[in-house]
């Protein structure tokens, strides 16, 4: 395995109450590609967590009164600050997450957009004028409904999008006037700390953002802390639902796992659908909750689609994430790649066929296409979170819908058809948070509502929708007589 391009190793402190604090248990972050040292930091203690909550409470007295134009200005400055440091962010994401550099740049661009949209939404948190004269006894009465920020919130983020999924917590919180205690993923905390530098420079008040790499016990104590008014969590279903039980009275926003299905009907160009499924299934080694995992193709075009899909997958280049030509880098760890390879072996032992891929080299798993799978196999019924897709034929469109729905998850699904009736049938019957027409499940633009049903979570992200989660309506009833 060739070595990744070396970069200077930086020491990172905690970001606590507007200060960079070099305290706590030291840790090192290593590249999942070649185990090269990427950076060093400190794991926060229970005392740091307590200080962060106090800081967030104190800063909230400032942010809840901050006018919308000022929140807009800060968010625009954050967006511009990320853009100015695009290469620095992209390289750090590639190193600590193993994401191919060109994919990392796309993530940075998305984060720039996320904060820019949040800046506009900060000025659109509107209220409502509500007439109350619906009965004779209430003539002359009316009401105003206005949204107020909840207060300090707790954000827990995953490794796979260490910038943009953090942005999806921080940007709407700042737009709403909430303060934040952020626990980044232990595999990728450095990108969050770099983002904290940008937010600090943009003028968000001290204590308004606290970034603490925390061990699980300290993080769980924060989850149960009633001074934090909302938990926004993105990660695995098992962890998310367990945290919900510990969250007490606070609001909970969960963006959890997926097992995304795609339907390819015969009236859509098979080559085009295959091309999109290659990108949607193997970008960032399939480590996204909306990555294409299960593909159901109408039998009349099944072989044509499969041939095109395998040809496209075989063109993908695996390797060093800092190499501009790399399409698929490592998984987040060798253990993760080993687990995914074991699932492939289990499927093959049960009769599945490897059409391409299937081999592992350290943390890199070859992009893999499986056929002759069925629901009970782990590669089909669980979230694979790896560069693996299953392709199966169907005869009747309703059967394809039933196959997609035969999952504990319901995040997004893709439907390739030009038949409007079939499309709206899918829209009505698919048990998911989002149906993507003419594209794969992995499509997401950052201002759209995003979230799932069943085991895939609670609530919605996507700036305006997250702001609604982070604010609460308050009524002023008026007697105007």
For each feature predicted by the language model, list its residue ranges.
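Rossmann-like NAD(P) dinucleotide-binding subdomain of oxidoreductase/dehydrogenase enzymes
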Residues: 130-272, 394
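ALDH superfamily catalytic-core signature
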Residues: 9, 238-374, 397, 403, ...
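Terminal low-complexity tails and localization/encapsulation signals of metabolic enzymes
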Residues: 1-40, 73, 77, 127-154, ...
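Residues at or immediately preceding the N-termini of alpha-helices
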Residues: 32, 46-49, 68, 101, ...
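Short, well-ordered beta-strand elements within core beta-sheets of diverse protein domains
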Residues: 38-44, 58-65, 154-155, 262-265, ...
């Amino acid at each position: 395995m060739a070595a990744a391009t070396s970069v200077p190793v930086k020491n990172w402190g905690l970001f606590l109450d507007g200060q960079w604090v070099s305290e706590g248990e030291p840790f090192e972050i290593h590249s999942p590609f070649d185990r090269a040292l990427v950076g060093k930091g400190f794991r926060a203690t229970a005392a740091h967590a307590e200080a962060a909550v106090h800081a967030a409470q104190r800063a909230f007295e400032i942010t809840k009164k901050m006018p919308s134009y000022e929140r807009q200005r800060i968010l625009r400055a954050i967006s511009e600050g990320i853009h100015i440091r695009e290469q620095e962010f992209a390289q750090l994401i590639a190193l600590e997450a193993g994401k191919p550099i060109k994919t990392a740049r796309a993530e940075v661009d998305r984060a720039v957009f996320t904060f820019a949209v949040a800046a506009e939404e900060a000025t659109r948190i509107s209220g409502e004028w509500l007439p109350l004269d619906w009965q004779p006894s209430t003539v002359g009465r009316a009401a105003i409904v206005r949204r107020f920020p909840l207060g300090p919130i707790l954000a827990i983020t995953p490794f796979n999008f260490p910038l943009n999924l953090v942005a999806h917590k921080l940007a709407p919180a700042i737009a709403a006037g909430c303060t934040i205690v952020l626990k980044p993923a232990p595999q990728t905390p450095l990108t969050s700390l770099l983002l904290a530098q940008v937010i600090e420079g943009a003028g968000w008040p001290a204590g308004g953002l606290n970034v603490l790499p925390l061990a699980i016990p300290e993080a769980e104590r924060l989850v149960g802390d009633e001074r934090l008014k909302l938990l926004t969590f993105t990660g695995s279903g098992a962890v998310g639902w367990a945290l919900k039980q510990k969250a007490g009275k606070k609001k909970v926003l969960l963006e959890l796992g997926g097992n995304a299905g795609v339907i390819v009907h015969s009236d859509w160009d098979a080559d085009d659908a295959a091309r999109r499924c290659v990108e949607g299934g193997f970008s960032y080694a399939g480590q996204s909750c909306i990555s294409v995992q299960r593909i159901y193709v109408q039998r009349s075009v099944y072989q044509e689609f499969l041939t095109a899909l395998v040809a496209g997958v075989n063109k993908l280049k695996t390797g060093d994430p800092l190499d501009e030509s790399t399409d698929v880098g490592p998984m987040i760890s060798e253990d993760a790649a080993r687990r995914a390879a074991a699932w492939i072996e289990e499927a093959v032992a049960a009769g599945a066929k490897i059409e391409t891929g299937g081999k592992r080299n350290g943390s890199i798993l070859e992009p893999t296409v499986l056929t002759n799978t069925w629901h009970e196999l782990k590669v089909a019924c669980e979230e694979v979170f790896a560069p693996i897709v299953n392709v199966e034929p169907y005869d009747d469109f309703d059967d394809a819908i039933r196959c997609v729905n035969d999952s504990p998850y319901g995040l997004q699904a893709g439907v390739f058809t030009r038949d409007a009736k079939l499309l709206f049938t899918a829209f009505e019957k698919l048990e998911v948070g989002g149906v993507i027409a003419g594209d794969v499940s992995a499509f997401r633009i950052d201002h759209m509502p995003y979230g799932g049903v069943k085991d895939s979570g609670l609530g919605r992200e996507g700036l305006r929708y997250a702001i609604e989660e982070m604010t609460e309506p308050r009524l002023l009833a008026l007697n105007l007589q």
